Regions:
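Conserved phosphate/metal-binding and DNA-contacting active-site motifs used
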Residues: 1-180
Length: 184
């Protein structure tokens, strides 16, 4: 999942035509500044959230402080392994050099991984333990969503903070939101 060494895909990425002519058994996408787009004049790179097993949604909520189901609908791929999927998001250019790959765990729960930079994600083809990768939300039907600000802020916080055993997430709320929450 992480390429290193001379001659890897980052030094000489393939065109779509070259990929189709390779005759391989899978296709992956490069993350970070290797896969970019421009939306309304602003540049973005590709990032992903990899939910890795039973309870990974609980790990996400525990660490990030927000239910994973509140993420915007986006292109998503799965390997066929139980409770695993990878969700793709556009990351604003100003975050591309700040955010790093993070593998986050909670005891007795599946982990989740925030993926970017010198990583790639398999999106099609064979998988060693299943019938292969498949789209949960296909790019033919869904756009890749822009990562929500709360996710970017959390990710930036854990990338720039000195290592700590416990990371607490405070969700920034407006005065109106706090009043509404307290009136329930």
């Amino acid at each position: 999942k992480e390429a290193s060494g001379k001659g890897n895909q980052y030094h000489s990425p393939y065109t779509l035509e070259e990929v189709l002519n390779k005759g391989g058994n899978g296709v992956g996408v490069l993350l970070g500044g290797h896969s970019t787009t421009t939306i309304n004049g602003k540049k973005y790179g590709l990032g992903a959230i990899d939910l890795d097993g039973t309870g990974s949604d609980i790990s996400f909520q525990h660490h990030v402080g927000i239910d994973v189901s509140t993420l915007p609908r986006t292109v998503t791929v799965a390997s066929g392994k139980k409770d695993r999927k990878q969700m793709f998001f556009w990351i604003p250019e100003e975050y591309l050099d700040v955010l790093k790959r993070k593998d986050i765990k909670l005891e007795n729960c599946g982990n989740f991984e925030l993926r970017i930079g010198n990583n790639y994600s398999m999106v099609a083809g064979k998988h060693p333990e299943t019938d292969g990768y498949f789209w949960v939300n296909s790019p033919a039907q869904f756009d890749i969503a822009i990562a929500p600000l709360w996710l970017l802020e959390y990710w930036e916080e854990i990338c720039t903070k000195k290592k700590s055993k416990f990371i607490q997430r405070r969700i920034r709320r407006t005065r109106e939101q706090l009043i509404h929450d307290s009136s329930r």
